[in-house]
């Protein structure tokens, strides 16, 4: 069974890390930094081609932030475009951002299935 395991770090570069696990196997990791009233997705890496695992990691991180009173999110992770595209982040002022309720809303099949 797939589980998105949170690990609170509270360091300068990472507030929480989420690991996608299937039993003992790690399928991916997402790092979140809460700062300046923003939930910042700073890193995403997958050990699988299944982009839905990455989407689940993003949703777990954004839900974590929302439960702590954060409303806006930015995506600063490098080399994670395919995963980022699973949620409707928009480019504004040179960065990818969105309000968490909109990012967590359903996609109604508008996901690139590649």
For each feature predicted by the language model, list its residue ranges.
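Conserved GNAT acetyl-CoA-binding A-motif
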Residues: 65-78
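Short, exposed beta-strand/loop patches in secreted or surface proteins that constitute
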Residues: 31-33, 73, 88-89
